[in-house]
Amino acid sequence: VTNSLPIALDLSSAGAGDVQLLGGSVRAITQAVVGGTALRTLALMRADVAFIGTNALTIDHGLSTADAQEAAVKSAMVTNAHTMVVLCDSTKIGNDYLVSFAPLDAIDVVITDEGAPETFVEELRRNDIKVVLARI
């Protein structure tokens, strides 16, 4: 299940099986599906794992983004998943955006790059968050 048009197309082109794309309005800038239809659909679903992208990640405010509609969809995904994996490159660490959509204690795993500040990585681990450092 995804709200991202590019990800849905990539997965289906790669033969990933049955890809569910949420319905709703499409934001031109991100090509993400948002709105009431997407939220109602997500309310009916449960996922073992949610992979969530973010615009910003801080210890105090968790995950945030600039758009309230995208934040609502991401928040619903977080709520309805057993495990939450955050995809966040190091340039987004320590930044805050307008709308917070998940607190730090909702995160199970953060996948970031080796540019992440070591003190930040240590703080995530102190909060029982697994950190995966990817080479780029």
PLM segments and residue spans:
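Conserved phosphate- and dinucleotide-binding cores of soluble alpha/beta proteins
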Residues: 6-136
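Catalytic beta/alpha-barrel core
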Residues: 1-2
